[in-house]
């Protein structure tokens, strides 16, 4: 097995990936705060790390993949109030919506999807340990983490703690200043503000957990004190992931994560502005899937290396659709040839080209999941494959090999080739009957009828291809 290299945000360099347990990988990816439908930017993270997970599984690793639901925080409380519902009901609605959207995008379910509200007992115990060790303190019912006590604070995001402290002091209000020992300290537990606000009993009074502590608790509970891979968007690098490290390593005394991976943003418009709910420039997956084929959206998002930005536009979506169509039509072409009764001609040429492409694919993906180079290698093979499929005598053994390989390669990107082909060709009786009538007209040299049927099929979104092996059709 060739070694996979990943870019580790903590060390700012590519490193050879070595899991704690040979053949097994523990992986935690920060999930959504479930107060609304996910937008394309949220989906980018889910798709990026699903693609990484799929490739690691393709390599033979057994991956335990944990991704949480943040089902209580300020946004949840505010949205529940605005919708005149409860936080649990709001969470349930949008957890179900998230699962529907990710299923449509063929994102594999996590091994575990823990919810913060189901881990309150563990969160309270975790916080108490930090207090006992001197890393946290109670103040007016809140509990804060002493950031400066953790000597590695700021290393993940490459920030100086003194500068962080200066920045925090400029944005802190008088009430927070009175509660905190230091402006840079962050909340582990938040006291209940209103009698009807969702809260749990704790040694410090009624309240709820802070966002950062939730992920520390859930990741270590289900994956252990040290995790192989922790992923998330670049916007989570600070303060969220920085705080996770501080909390977790202070509690356990062990390295929290061996490899930190962060995906790039989705941008929109000519100015390539970051897509976010706070900027009100987002498009939800729920809405976009009403207009865009889920496989096209999935392929578009998966075909850009995870650390790079993606510019979301109709033009870029169309480009992805065109590439996907090329793969689709090649598979349809192969299927027709494999099903016809023409003799096969075995040859080493195509088999060798497939083996070389497989090598290029894996070399690219082993290099920090370079999906662009991997897809280029596959795409460059298509003319050779199609030429063989259209030859008088095709190498059917190698065509079958390519079909199987392409299915495995594209599955890494979340594309199911059987589903892809079912959208392109099939046993639609109406179309088959029209094609049959056209063939009969051609045999009689009734070109007017033949052309009329071709035009009729074109209006139905069907493209006709006349080959030595017979007439083939695909959906546009």
Swiss-Prot record:
Cofactor note: Binds 1 zinc ion per subunit.
The EC number(s) this enzyme carries: 6.1.1.16
GO-annotated molecular function: ATP binding; cysteine-tRNA ligase activity; zinc ion binding
Catalytic reaction equation(s): tRNA(Cys) + L-cysteine + ATP = L-cysteinyl-tRNA(Cys) + AMP + diphosphate
The keyword Repressor belongs to this UniProt entry's keyword annotation: no
GO biological process, one term: cysteinyl-tRNA aminoacylation
Gene3D superfamilies xrefs: Cysteine-tRNA ligase, C-terminal anti-codon recognition domain (1.20.120.1910), HUPs (3.40.50.620)
A Pfam family that the UniProt record links to this protein: DALR_2
InterPro entries linked to this entry: Cys-tRNA-ligase, Cys-tRNA-synt_Ia_DALR, Cys-tRNA/MSH_ligase, CysS_C, Rossmann-like_a/b/a_fold, tRNA-synt_1_cat_dom, tRNAsynth_Ia_anticodon-bd
Cofactor: Zn(2+)
Subcellular location: Cytoplasm
Principal cellular location given in the protein's record: cytoplasm
Motif range ('HIGH' region): 32-42
GO cellular component: cytosol
Motif annotated as 'KMSKS' region, chain positions: 274-278
CDD domains for this protein: CysRS_core
Binding site for ATP: 277
Family: Belongs to the class-I aminoacyl-tRNA synthetase family.
Subunit structure: Monomer.
Name the record gives this protein: Cysteine--tRNA ligase
Organism of this sequence: Lactobacillus helveticus (strain DPC 4571)
